[in-house]
Amino acid sequence: MTLLATTSIAAISLYAMLSTVYKSAQVFHARRTTISTTPAKDIETNPVPSVDVIVPCFNEDPIVLSECLASLAEQDYAGKLRIYVVDDGSKNRDAVVAQRAAYADDERFNFTILPKNVGKRKAIAAITQSSGDLILNVDSDTTIAPDVVSKLAHKMRDPAVGAAMGQMKASNQADTWLTRLIDMEYWLACNEERAAQARFGAVMCCCGPCAMYRRSAMLSLLDQYETQLYRGKPSDFGEDRHLTILMLSAGFRTEYVPSAIAATVVPDTMGVYLRQQLRWARSTFRDTLLALPVLPGLDRYLTLDAIGQNVGLLLLALSVLTGIGQFALTATLPWWTILVIGSMTLVRCSVAAYRARELRFLGFALHTLVNIFLLIPLKAYALCTLSNSDWLSRGSVAIAPTVGQQGATKMPGRATSEIAYSGE
């Protein structure tokens, strides 16, 4: 047996053992009830909080934006609700103007128009104009069920909770084989990974398309959130994970509400999907380092979660790489590696199909091939290019002052404001 074959067998065997422990614990905790640190009677007697919804948009499809705002207008919420739409220097600004006209008589809606693209973190600075107890961030390509605000706000009535997210689905699931695969990927990410983390009040990333934050907590973290640097350069993506980790660092709980359903548009071509995954991989690697000091204060499961995701990825990559080397040099297939990966894929897909009560999850086996031959090399590239903050889907954004700071002026208007920046 060659050194390559031995290494491949050892790596995949360690990967199998680690993944078995990690995934078993994940499924076990995902099925259990979240522990609340506040007595239920105290939560129920808290007043219904006011909610401000912030919708940052950039070059959004007019139909998609219209559907997003319509879903917000139809929210069934007993408390006060305001909606702030922030156009981040879109080239198709007519789409936003049309929506402004459509909701001109709805006092809940406020439209802010930025003259140039400044990035999502700066667009979310509309929080400084708002006054709600809670802030709900909704991406402009996302529609939410009528009860989402109510369900997330109910979870946030526990003062120990700083952030909460809903369950993500693909609104364009039926378009291509890739969108179907991504929809299943979202289900697993929400109902296994996030659900298990929420068991201990420590969801590590509240997904941006539908995430609610406590305004008082967010204001105290806003400067850190807006000015995140990596190796001396502004970090312009991964804002969801970064803000969540800041919440955990400040001592707040972060939660997952599976019954709060949000549907978002997902990539329907492989090129767009891989560019998205590259951005996410870079931000995940960056913020994993930021999260390390937080882990000792959380339940031990969260340490296992970090090890399972990162060390597991390294072991799988090593086994695949040495297996390919074995085949290239000796013309013999790494049968043990293939058998272990195939068996683990079958078990995982079967468990998902059983838990979701949907046979389509058996087809998620295709994701294993995508992961091995596309995502692992992409993540290796991301690890080697962590300093690159290019969005890949658009040009670099300008860094501008926060709304309301010196250098920003607000034009008169009841439901519309236009912010002009003096700096680059």
From Swiss-Prot:
Involved in the synthesis of Nod factor, a sulfated N-acyl-beta-1,4-tetrasaccharide of N-acetylglucosamine which initiates a series of events in the host plant species leading eventually to nodulation. Changing residue 110 to K: In strain: USDA 2478. InterPro entries: Chitooligosach_Synthase_NodC, Glyco_trans_2-like, Nucleotide-diphossugar_trans. It holds the Pfam family Glycos_transf_2. Keywords: Cell membrane, Glycosyltransferase, Membrane, Nodulation, Plasmid, Transferase. It is found in: Cell membrane. Its EC number is 2.4.1.-. The lineage of its organism: Bacteria, Pseudomonadati, Pseudomonadota, Alphaproteobacteria, Hyphomicrobiales. Belongs to the NodC/HAS family. One of its GO terms (molecular function) is hyaluronan synthase activity. The gene is nodC. The keyword NAD does not apply. This is N-acetylglucosaminyltransferase. The keyword Nucleotidyltransferase does not apply. GO terms for biological process: extracellular matrix assembly; hyaluronan biosynthetic process.
